Amino acid sequence: MKLLILDRDGVINYDSDAYIKTLEEWVPIPGSVDAIAQLSKAGWTVAVATNQSGIARGYYPLATLEAMHARLRALVAEQGGEVGHIVYCPHGPDEGCDCRKPKPGMLRAIAEHYQIGLEGVWFVGDSKGDLEAALAVGAQPVLVKTGKGERTLEKGVPETTLIFDDLAAIARELI
């Protein structure tokens, strides 16, 4: 199985320091939906692992998050692709859960879902927490310069991190 795991906000869609709280605020980064569809059509399983503490903070209900993910799935399907397993952490940063990145709980849940190990699997993110979660499970950390990626890069990243401009560049590399 060829598995690619993506963070959501800042990788697939535009991010906001004020959170993505409505379906209208969920706007794909140009090329990201096409990249997921192309990867899927080329035999890649594309899963998503996303921190969504806005739920715990009361900024939006679970139904809104599910609508965003349904929109993502529909947009990718329109281009002939498929989004695999989507996992999210609804907890706030002080709740002590095992799923909120940089903890690796969501990545482990994806591995369990697909019954595979994560050694060498690419986990694409735009933050230090994403890269740390990848390293915690032996996955390959991959940074995109979209979202918070440029700021993350300026602060320094683990030396094994692969760096790409965006998700479309990753698709070109892997296909």
UniProtKB/Swiss-Prot annotation:
Organism: Pseudomonas putida (strain ATCC 47054 / DSM 6125 / CFBP 8728 / NCIMB 11950 / KT2440)
Gene Ontology CC terms, in alphabetical order: cytoplasm
Site keyed Contributes to substrate recognition: positions: R100
Domain of life: Bacteria
Assembly, per entry: Monomer.
Active site per the UniProt annotation: D7 (nucleophile), D9 (proton donor)
Molecular functions per Gene Ontology: D-glycero-beta-D-manno-heptose 1,7-bisphosphate 7-phosphatase activity; metal ion binding
PANTHER family according to UniProt: D-GLYCERO-BETA-D-MANNO-HEPTOSE-1,7-BISPHOSPHATE 7-PHOSPHATASE
Catalytic activity, reaction form: D-glycero-beta-D-manno-heptose 1,7-bisphosphate + H2O = D-glycero-beta-D-manno-heptose 1-phosphate + phosphate
Gene that encodes the chain: gmhB
Protein name: D-glycero-beta-D-manno-heptose-1,7-bisphosphate 7-phosphatase
Pathway connected to this protein: Nucleotide-sugar biosynthesis; ADP-L-glycero-beta-D-manno-heptose biosynthesis; ADP-L-glycero-beta-D-manno-heptose from D-glycero-beta-D-manno-heptose 7-phosphate: step 2/4; Bacterial outer membrane biogenesis; LPS core biosynthesis
